[in-house]
């Protein structure tokens, strides 16, 4: 599945054939078909496992926070760090999630989109608990999507051997949240 994710990331899902995946795996197309009946089946299993992994991370962070009696902000910060650690090792799977879900059949796409919604809902809850004075029903979607906007596309530009590590980037994201959400929003004065 990791090899297939790499093929999808390099060539795009539509441009990748079963021959390409088999060649990248160093096996025959017939052997690949022994395990998967189609390229769609590979994509679905890849995305199904990856989205399940993201939900497991959320559960692990919640359990660790409970055991360690972390406050809500520390719990959110732990989640951001955990997601970015996962993104560092799952760049091609994450790219497939963001770019290739649309190519699944309706039922399979629905499963993956529901999982994505579950992840977004969980992050929204983490944000609301961490910054109850700033995140509410009015702005929760915008703030949640801002956070995802900061972290979801790291696979396109953040390199483990680059000048900024994933851990250091997590510190930057957390600092931006802290500076941006820990103080009351200034209201515009009437003109």
Residue ranges of predicted features:
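Helix-turn-helix
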Residues: 3-41, 45
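Short coil/turn segments at alpha/beta junctions that flank glycine-rich nucleotide-binding fingerprints
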Residues: 10-14, 90, 133
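Short, structured helix-loop boundary elements
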Residues: 18, 40, 44, 69, ...
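Hydrophobic alpha-helical connector segments
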Residues: 45, 59-89, 143-147
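Alpha-helical bundle regulatory/interaction domains
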Residues: 46, 50-53, 186
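Amphipathic alpha-helical packing segments from all-alpha helical-bundle domains
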Residues: 52-59, 106-132, 141-145, 171
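Short secondary-structure transition hinges
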Residues: 84-124, 135, 156-158
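C-terminal peripheral helix-coil segments that are non-catalytic and often amphipathic
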Residues: 85, 89, 120-129, 148-150, ...
